[in-house]
Design a protein with these regions (language model features):
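A conserved mid-domain beta-alpha-beta active-site/ligand-binding segment of alpha/beta enzyme cores
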Residues: 201-259
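C-terminal target-recognition/interaction regions appended to catalytic cores
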Residues: 283-416
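Short amphipathic alpha-helix with an adjacent loop that forms part of the alpha/beta core around
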Residues: 139-151, 174
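A short, conserved alpha-helix within the catalytic core of class I
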Residues: 165-175
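Conserved beta strand-loop-helix elements of the APE1-like EEP
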Residues: 266-276
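Conserved beta-strand signature within the Rossmann-like core of class I S-adenosyl-L-methionine
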Residues: 181-193
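Class I SAM-dependent methyltransferase Rossmann-like catalytic core
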Residues: 2-46, 64
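SAM cofactor-binding core of SAM-dependent methyltransferases
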Residues: 31-142, 362-369, 373
Length: 416
């Protein structure tokens, strides 16, 4: 086992690595945005949610002379802080009714986690916290049963921080999404470890086949000429397979560079709802994700795209320069996309977001701004949810609808 993740009986904490810090920061930022946006209705007085940490570890790390929270404590404190923050602005108090399920298959890690919780004044029999010793997959049926028994919509976040890529089968993720409507998964996946150790024989193994790795995939990977581009394209192909085989509608990769191992790790966010993906995308921009996918940020497709081999310089990252580029790309790409989905009638903005959500690095706000520009340029007309025309320049919302302008315009007449 990697020595940076060993919690022994002597109580010594493992030293935290930079990429682990970053991973936990991403998790924390995501949870903050999640809670800040999930309860929109001021009349709502309760939020039921279960947070599952399927690979919880021992709860804390050493960072020089300081102690740093591990993922179980990040989950607990994110909920405690959200409860305070959200109630500051509310007349009707909101209760976050959260349950926590922590799983680890190392007995010593479970013991360390219990010690850590106790030292932070969580009672051993705290009814909100369940700790399982054993593998995540073995405990998954009991976890799902626990959630569905009391939560109709199954609002839950699964943080699945495996070491490599073999402890969370795609079938487990499909089971989560099939069982719980409002579930989200944040999956750690050692994407470069998988690629670096691929052998011809891997194509025969179900472990690899579940990620779409077959003989053709392996031979394309081995024959790569340009290391950076070949790796980026193969990572992309793998992401597309993981997305397709996970049963999730939305997929957002967040790349973390491990200096110790000299390789990329992927933290993927998987969800069934566009709003959830939009929240994760907000974290990408905030944290300047080092996911440099090949190609434009405006509209793209994950998955292998041979044409990108010719455009080695077109890597996209989440910088301010890219944000400007992204707006320009969206201005050019959206009209034809809207026309394609619209089929001549009206198009709800919510549907547009759901259609293009996986294929853009733009957040909903970025897309609203571009739509607003297109409306001001009379390329589009915007109707409110009750069908009233909106003045160009007014704020656009997810419930609005788009129609083509009565007069043909530059974009639409040029393209169709
Ligand atoms: C990367 S560490 C987790 C770190 C922790 N999530 C954090 O951020 O503080 C992975 C943990 O998963 C545990 N583990 C390994 N295989 C497992 C499995 N199949 N099911 C559950 N836990 C497992 C290990 O014992 C280890 O504590």
């Amino acid at each position: 086992m990697a020595k940076n993740f060993i919690w022994g009986p002597d109580g010594r904490l493992p030293h935290i690595e930079d990429h682990t810090k970053r991973k936990l920061e991403v998790l924390k930022s995501y949870l903050d945005i999640y809670f800040d946006t999930v309860v929109r209705n001021p009349a709502q007085d309760r939020l039921n949610i279960t947070l599952v940490d399927g690979f919880s570890g021992g709860g804390a790390y050493a960072d020089g002379a300081e102690t740093r929270s591990g993922s179980p404590l990040v989950l607990l404190s994110a909920v405690e802080q959200a409860a305070v923050r959200l109630n500051e602005r509310r007349e009707k108090p909101l209760k976050i009714n959260a349950r926590f399920i922590f799983v680890d298959d190392e007995f010593e890690h479970v013991a360390a986690l219990r010690r850590e919780l106790k030292s932070r004044d969580y009672a051993e029999d705290d009814p909100r916290i369940t700790i399982y010793h054993g593998t995540f997959v073995d405990h998954l049926p009991a976890i799902l049963q626990k959630i569905t028994k009391t939560q109709i919509k199954g609002r839950s976040i699964f943080f699945l921080d495996q070491f490599g890529y073999s402890d969370v089968p795609m079938s487990a993720i499909r089971t989560i999404f099939n069982s719980l409507d409002r579930s989200e998964v944040v999956l750690n996946f050692a994407i470069d470890s998988l690629l670096n150790y691929l052998q011809d024989a891997s194509a025969e193994l179900e472990l690899y086949r579940q990620f779409g790795v077959d003989a053709r995939f392996i031979s394309d990977w081995k024959q790569r000429k340009d290391e950076k581009m070949g790796r980026a394209l193969t990572q992309r192909a793998l992401m597309a397979h993981i997305h397709a085989n996970s049963g999730a509608k939305f997929f957002t990769p967040f790349m973390l560079w491990s200096r110790t191992d000299n390789r990329w790790m992927m933290l993927a966010h998987l969800s069934q709802h566009q709003a959830a993906r939009d929240k994760m995308l907000g974290v990408h921009w905030q944290k300047q994700n080092s996911f440099t996918h090949a190609g434009p940020g405006g509209l793209f497709n994950l998955g292998y795209d041979a044409r990108l081999k010719e455009s080695c310089d077109s890597f996209f990252s989440f910088s301010e320069i890219d944000r400007t580029k992204l707006s320009r790309e969206l201005i050019n790409a959206l009209p034809s996309e809207i026309h394609r989905i619209m089929h001549g009638g009206q198009l709800e903005i919510g549907r547009l977001l759901a259609e293009i959500g996986n294929r853009t690095a733009g957040t909903n706000e970025d897309i609203f701004e571009v739509l607003s520009e297109l409306a001001q340029a009379r390329e589009l007309e915007v109707l409110s949810s009750i069908g009233r025309p909106k003045r160009a320049g007014t704020k656009i919302s997810i419930k609005d609808r788009l129609i083509l302008p009565s007069q043909p315009t530059l974009f639409f007449s040029k393209k169709f």
